[in-house]
C-alpha cells in the first residue's frame, strides 16, 4: 500500500534551481496537517511521494534516534529508504523490507544525510498493532487432537514401564481368570521392547507438542501482550493436560487397565513412528546393552531390600544374601592366631576337660606339638562319650591317644579327619559341600609359589553367620540366660575346686552322687524346684560333722545325711546295720539302679549304700511352715528312734529346721571359703504353685531368719568331739 505524503524541503543554502550539493544542508519547512504521524506493521513494505524543491536523488533514511545527527550511534536502528523516481519538485521513496519494530523500538523518523536539524513536523512512523486473528474451528480441534496424542504418549510411557518383567511374570502366575492373564500378556508384549517403546512415545509426544505450540502461537497473533501469552499459554496447557494429568492417571490403579485396553492405539503409533523410532532404539540398545529399565545398581538393590524387610534382622539377612556369592573363604575365616587348639601331646586331665567345657567349642583342632600351622586332627566334643567308652579319662590320656582310640572305632560316624580348602575359594561353594554332611570344619590354606601354610579355620557356623548375622547363643535380654550363665560358671568352678581344696573332703563325683541321692529320696525338695546347685548350698561345708565309734547321734528335729561310715539303725520295725560308702570310681547306671533296689528290698542290709537319710519327718514340718500342701510320704521305717556309729568314724551332714528354712529363703549362702552371704529365694516358685486351683494352702508366710549355728552344736568336720 502506498502512502502519499506532501512535504516541502527548502534548501538553507544554494540557488532555487540548482541541485543539492554535498555542502548544502536540507531543512524541513513544513508538512500537510494530519499526515505527520503514520502507523505501519512490523516489516511491512511501503512507499510514499515526497514534494519539494531541489530534492536530492538519494540519502534518505529512517532512524530511531531523536536527532538525525545521532543516527550513526551503535544503539540506534537505521533503515535506508530507496528513491524509485526523482524529479525537480517531488520524489517517490520506498522501504521494501519495512521497518523492524520491536519492544525497544516503536518510532522511526525520516532523515536526510545532509540534514542537521530535526523538528516534530518531520515524518514520524509508529508501529501498528495487528488485529487479533479470529479463531477457527479446525484450529481448535487440531490443538485438542495434539494435546490428546501428547497426553497419551506421556501417560502410556509410565503405564507400560511401571512394572518390570519380574513383576509381570509374578502377576501372570497369580492372575485369576483368562481376562486378567490376557491383559498381562498384552503389557508384556510391549514391555519386552522397552527401549523401542520409550523412543516411540518420546518421539510421538515431541512431534505433537511442537505442532500444538506452533498452532497456538498463530492463534494468539495480534492479541494484547502477545509475547507473554505465546510463551505462557502453550507451556501451561502442555504441563497440565499433556504431562501432569495423564501421568497421574496412569500411575494409579487405572494405568494398567488403560494400557491393556488401548493396546491397538499403541500398535498404530509403533507403525507410524517405525522408520525413525526403530533405528534410534537399536542405537540406544547398542550403547546401553541391556533394558534401560531392568538395570539396577547395587545401591538400588540395597534400598529395595531395605524397603522389603519388616525388621532389622530381615534386612540384615537380605543384604547379606545379595553379596554372599562374592565372598571368599578368606573373608569369613577365623585367623589361626585366634583359634583355640590343643597340642597332640597335651593330656586330657581335669583342667583340660573343664577348659574345653568352659570354652564351649564343639570342634577343637589338634596341632602337631609346637607347630600350630600343622593341623593333624580334630577333636569333636560330641565324641567324648565314645572316648570314655574306649579310654579311661582318669588315667589322663594324651590327645594323641584319644584320637587314636577314636580312629580304632569302626563306627564311621566318628569324623576326626581335617579338610583343607583354598583361601580364594568361594564361600557359597564351600557351604554346598558342607551341607552334604561330610564335614562342618575346614582348615584354610594359603598357597604361595613354593610353599603353603594354614592361615585359619572356617566352620559352617562362620558361613551361616555371614548370611543370618552373628549367632549369639547368650541372649542378654533374657533373665533366664544370665541365671544359666551363673549356674554354668558355678558348676565349672565347683568341678575345678572339688578334690583339690582341703575344704572339699570329697571328689566332685562323690559330691554329685550325694546331692543326686538327696533329691531322689526327698520328693518335697523337688516340689520347691531345688536343683543340684541349691542342694549344694543346703549341704554346705559348715554342716559336716564326724561321729566316733559307739556315739549315739542326736535325732530330735534334725535331718542327717550320712555319706561315710557304718551305723546301727533302730526304727519302729527293726534294728539293722547299714554301711554307707560313696563310690569314688565311675560306675554305670546299671550298678546304681541295682544298689538302689537292694537298699529298699534287701533285708540283710549288708550292701553298702551311697547315702543314708535319717529324719524325713522334719521335711514335712518344713513344708507345713511354708504353708505348702506338698508333704513327704512316710512309713514306719522312717521313724528312727536311735542311731549309733559302728565304724571308727561316720561323716554326715547335720541339718536343722532353721538351716533348711534359711537356705530356702535365701538368707544364707555359703561360698568356697565357708563364709555365709545372702542367697536367692525360692519362695516365689512355692507361691506360684500354691496359687493353683487344686491347692488349699493358706497364704504363705516367711519365717524370720535363724542363725544356723548354735552354741550346743557338735564339733565341725575334721575336729574331734569332746
UniProtKB/Swiss-Prot annotation:
Transmembrane segments: 140-160, 197-217, 228-248, 258-278
Keyword vocabulary terms for this entry: CBS domain, Cell membrane, Glycoprotein, Ion transport, Membrane, Repeat, Signal, Transmembrane, Transmembrane helix, Transport
Record topology, Cytoplasmic segments: 161-196, 249-257
Extracellular face of the membrane: 18-139, 218-227, 279-722
Effect of deleting the gene: No visible phenotype. Quintuple knockout with cnnm-1, cnnm-2, cnnm-3 and cnnm-4 results in a reduced lifespan and 100% sterility.
Location of this chain's protein in the cell: Cell membrane
Record-linked Gene3D superfamilies: CBS-domain
Biased amino acid composition, Low complexity: 688-703
Region (Disordered): 584-607, 686-722
Signal peptide: 1-17
Function: Probable metal transporter. Probably acts redundantly with the other metal transport proteins cnnm-1, cnnm-2, cnnm-3 and cnnm-4 to regulate Mg(2+) homeostasis.
Family recorded in the similarity comment: Belongs to the ACDP family.
Protein name: Metal transporter cnnm-5
Native source organism of the sequence: Caenorhabditis elegans
